[in-house]
């Protein structure tokens, strides 16, 4: 661990929980949590360009890679430790997303960070899906960079967050090791309210820097628990004859409304033909200034 540069040399085969266990005694964390966190490795994250829990800004593992070491059929390919370089093509970009085609990633120097102690969280409801994604756009384009900016459509908010099923839910969360997060959260909440979002002031959760996480109560906490359980529920539902899966993409804001409408029409029709009906829901996994990354879930009886 290089505490001064905030970087660590980590072997590619380490599983997510073990990686965090090794960094914790030093007071650091990688802070990259894909949904497969428990059963996937650092090397796997890098060669698949894994998306993590940050919904804005540092959304993918790319942002944490300082240098890589890969064993290839032609020998060892190792890049230099540099904070950045403008000297031609980046060798790390060859490794990121290579999916094992070039060789086996054995280790990497990763950018790490101090464990966050300041947290702030809010969950706002909207009368429509459209109002919810307009709020998400306003927040991300203000460049406040919340760690969490998840939008759930009414179906997903109803099944995973315990809402009535006729409201969209926007989850906003900030975290920092050094700076209280009340100001950025209140600015994000203000923007979301202006777009039609609803939340009582007492439901806005802000920690005092004691390392106590917030946002585990109410609809926000219910969705978080559902998100963690989701990968394990598929085996159970498959045994009950339920056909279900997920798919995701990204698209620019100007094309998003018509794209979403077309996807929903096509999937609803397919579920009706194949399963006699079913459910389709959507949430934003990551949100960029120029567009969202929607994640669709569907299920029906086989």
Task: For each feature predicted by the language model, list its residue ranges.
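FAD-binding subdomain of flavoenzyme oxidoreductases
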Residues: 1-150
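C-terminal substrate-recognition/cap domain of FAD-linked oxidoreductases
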Residues: 114, 120, 125, 133-302
């Amino acid at each position: 661990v290089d505490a001064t540069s905030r970087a660590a040399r980590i072997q590619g085969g380490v599983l997510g929980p073990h990686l965090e266990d090794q960094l914790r005694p030093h007071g650091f964390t990688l802070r990259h949590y894909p949904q497969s966190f428990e059963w996937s490795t650092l090397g796997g994250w890098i060669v698949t360009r894994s998306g993590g829990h940050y919904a804005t800004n540092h959304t993918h593992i790319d942002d944490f890679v300082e240098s890589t070491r890969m064993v290839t059929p032609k020998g060892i390919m190792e890049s230099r430790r540099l904070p950045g370089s403008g000297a031609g093509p980046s060798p790390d970009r060859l490794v990121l997303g290579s999916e094992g085609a070039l060789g086996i990633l054995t280790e990497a120097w990763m950018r790490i960070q101090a464990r966050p102690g300041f947290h702030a969280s809010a969950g706002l409801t909207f009368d429509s899906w459209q109002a919810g994604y307009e709020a998400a756009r306003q927040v991300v384009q203000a460049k406040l960079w919340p760690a969490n900016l998840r939008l759930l459509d009414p179906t997903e908010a109803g099944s995973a967050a315990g809402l009535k099923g006729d409201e969209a839910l926007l989850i906003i969360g900030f975290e920092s090791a050094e700076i209280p997060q009340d100001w950025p959260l209140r600015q994000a909440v203000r923007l979301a309210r202006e777009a039609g979002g609803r939340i009582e002031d007492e439901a806005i959760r802000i920690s005092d820097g004691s390392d106590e996480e917030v946002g585990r109560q109410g609809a926000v906490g219910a969705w978080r628990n559902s998100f963690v359980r989701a990968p394990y529920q598929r085996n159970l539902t498959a045994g009950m004859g339920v056909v279900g899966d997920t798919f995701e993409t990204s698209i620019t804001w100007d094309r998003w409304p018509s794209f979403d409408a077309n996807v929903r029409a096509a999937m609803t029709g397919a579920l009706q033909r194949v399963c006699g009906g079913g459910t389709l829901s959507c949430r934003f996994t990551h949100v960029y200034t120029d567009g969202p990354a929607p994640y669709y879930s569907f299920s029906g009886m086989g």
